[in-house]
Regions:
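Non-catalytic, solvent-exposed interaction/assembly segments
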Residues: 1-133
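N-terminal "pre-motor" subdomain/linker immediately upstream of P-loop NTPase catalytic cores
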Residues: 39, 57, 98-192
Length: 192
């Protein structure tokens, strides 16, 4: 295939094929690629074993400055982190509490897309499982094993898959499963 026109024909690019198709021309080592959360893409590659890679939203320098402002403002704040992967998924779906959102809105001046990126990273670092958050969002991960120098995950279809994580904080929460959820009635409200 050539990128130059020959005769009266215009150059064409072949139609994309699924990553696991043996004739795929664009990423032969990619076995699976999915967006697990807005802007968060997971790729499973196969070379010498499986590799589980996470691509998170890209922060501009202005977004990074805004994130640092938010993180320094909330440094020492009592924001409870989820105790399980299920809790992390719920937290990411709900976002910050309204009072925290108002504070962040006052602190951050950026585009709506930049605001979403900053909110994602702030949620991960302040109110979720840090660098483990995107892994918690992928419901295809069945098991996570901590080795001497990395974290290895087992997905429904690919195992073991090495990750870029070495010794992440909150790994015990990531590995925990919610057994049940209980509430207590108080003044007409259900308190978890």
């Amino acid at each position: 295939m050539s990128g130059r026109a020959t005769g009266g024909r215009r150059p064409t690019v072949p139609a994309p094929l699924a990553p696991d198709d043996p004739d795929a021309w664009y990423a032969p080592d990619v076995r699976e690629q999915d967006e697990i959360h807005p802007g968060v893409v997971v790729t499973v590659r196969q070379a010498d074993g499986f590799r589980y890679e996470v691509r998170e939203p890209v922060l501009s320098s202005r977004d990074r400055d805004a994130l640092e402002t938010v993180e320094s403002h909330f440094d020492g704040a009592n924001i409870e982190r989820p105790r399980t992967r299920e809790g992390a998924v719920e937290r990411m779906e709900q976002g910050f509490d309204p009072k925290h959102r108002r504070v962040i809105d006052r602190l951050v001046e950026c585009s709506p897309a930049g605001r979403r990126r900053v909110a994602y990273y702030a949620l991960c670092s302040l109110a979720c499982l840090g660098e483990l958050t995107p892994y918690a969002l992928d419901d295809r991960i069945d098991v996570a094993d901590v080795t001497e120098d990395s974290v290895v995950v087992h997905t429904e279809d690919y195992a073991p898959a090495t990750t870029a994580l070495s010794d992440p904080e909150f790994i015990e929460r990531f590995a925990s499963e919610r057994v049940g959820r209980h509430t207590v009635s108080f003044q007409g409200f259900e308190i978890p």
